[in-house]
Amino acid sequence: CCNTCAFCVSVGEKPIRTLSIDSIRRRLQIIHEHGIKNVRVLDRTFNYNARRAKELLQLFLEFPDIRFHLEIHPALLSEELKEELRRLPQGLLHLEAGIQSLREPVLKQSRRMGKLSDALAGLELHCSLPNMEPHAALIAGLPHYHLNEYFEEVYPLAGYNAGEIQLESLKLLPGTEMRRQAETLGIHYSPFPPYEVLETNEISVGELQTARQLSRLLDGFYNTPAWHALTRELILNDKTFLHKFLEYLIRINLIDQPMSLEKRGLILYEYCKQNCPEYQTQASIAWIE
C-alpha cells in the first residue's frame, strides 16, 4: 500500500509492486469460468495510482456479472477517476471508503495520508452517485479518539447517506508502528490474537465496550437495507437519537443478542411508539415492506 498508516501491516516496501493488466485479465477469466460472482481486491488503496485504477475499472467492465469489492482512499481521488466512477454501471462495484476518523489529530497520529477535507469531499461525491453505495469505515481505539466523537461522527456520514457506516475496533498487529509505540501512546491491548485494543489514554475499557455496542446498533439498523432509511432519518433529525436508542437496547437486554430482521423492525417500531410517535407510521410501513 502507498499509505503510511501506523496501525496497518500493509505499509511495506516502495514502490508498490503491481500485476500486469493482462495477467489480471487471465485470472478474472478463470474466476468467471468457475461462476464466482464476487471478487475482493485486496489492495488497501485501490486508487493510489489514478491511471492504473482507471485501467482496472475498464477491465472490470469486461466482467459485468462479477461484483468487485474495492477499498479506496477518498482523499486521493483525481478528477479523471471521479468521471470514470460516474460512468460505471450500477452494481459493478462495492466501495469501502477508508475514512478512519473525522478528527485531524487522530489522523495525524495515525500517519494517514491526504487531507481530511479532501477525504470528505471524495466521500460526498461517491454518496451522490446513483450507481454507487459506498461504505464508510471508522476505527475505534485510535489514539486521541474519544467515545463521544464516535457518536458525533456518525451524523455527518449519515448526512452524506453512506450506504453503510462501519465502526471497527483497532487491532495492534505485530510489526506495526503503532504496536511498537503502544506504551508511549498509552494503548493497552490484548496479548492474544486479534490483539484488540482494550483501552487508551482517551477511552476506558467500558467506553470501548460502548463503542462495540454502537457498532452493533449501526450494523443491525443503519446498515440493514430494510431499516436504513428510517434509522438515517432518526439520526439526522435528533443528534441524541443514537445515545437514546442504544440506552433503550441495553435496557431491554437486546444489544448483545442476535436479532432477526423482523425482531429489529418490531424493536424500532416500539422505540418510535414510546419516544418519537411522529415516526410510528413510517416504522410500520418499513416493517410491512
Where are these regions (language model features)?
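Canonical Radical SAM [4Fe-4S] cluster-binding loop centered on the CxxxCxxC motif
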Residues: 1-22
